Amino acid sequence: MRVNITLECTECHEQTYLTSKNKRNNPDRIELKKYCPRDHKVTLHRETK
């Protein structure tokens, strides 16, 4: 079952990315390194509700 999630930057707390994940394969919250347009660098982004 795939669900849509929002990724939030851990430094500036801006929600910039929408993606989907499979809850069966990834039951925990996802953490990805993505580019943050506000900080102009690659930062850690965490899944939000």
Curated annotation (Swiss-Prot):
PANTHER family to which the protein is assigned, alphabetical: 50S RIBOSOMAL PROTEIN L33, CHLOROPLASTIC, LARGE RIBOSOMAL SUBUNIT PROTEIN BL33C
Highest taxon in the source lineage: Bacteria
Underlying gene: rpmG1
Record keywords, A-Z: Ribonucleoprotein, Ribosomal protein
Family classification: Belongs to the bacterial ribosomal protein bL33 family.
GO biological process, one term: translation
Transmembrane segment boundaries: none
HAMAP family: Ribosomal_bL33
A Gene Ontology cellular-component term: ribosome
Protein name (database record): Large ribosomal subunit protein bL33A
Family annotation (SUPFAM superfamilies): Zn-binding ribosomal proteins
Any one GO molecular function term: structural constituent of ribosome
Lineage summary: Bacteria, Bacillati, Bacillota, Bacilli, Lactobacillales
PROSITE patterns xref list: RIBOSOMAL_L33 (PS00582)
